[in-house]
């Protein structure tokens, strides 16, 4: 079972991100209402619809779809929340040293592609976490996605005390975290919901407008 990265060249036209939402029905009450409770940590799902693919994009899509081998393999796909998440300029406002804590000879540091040093600890099942964003400022608000490891979450409520955010999240924490880096460019490990999903039909034998769906996978640890 393999995990590969979604190619950066294939950007969908429309994206539907469905957050965890599964409920379980309980017994019917005396007033004929059925009580429901949330299922414990159900998966995210992601549907991507593409504009007309042709040329090299058709070949890239074919290669990705074939690499999935039905539901046998998984893909690491970004959530494509580019208009609402923190900008790359804001994220790259952070800098880091070499692994031994030293800088370059002229004092320069590395720029980061995501947050650096924003760490989260929590136990499985927790709904609320805290994180100190330091010099990054207040980059997270309710409605934004974030990542802990390979797991995406959505912030349902955020309150700030200086640079420290108290974040209510959905779903509840999928596992225990010990100083896990918080990411504002989250990805999701997903697999097809069925073997035939995402098939590419070529119109005029040349171009196609495929749609593909992924369900979050929990087969970790991923490598």
Language-model features: locations:
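Extracellular/virion structural assembly segments
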Residues: 1-223
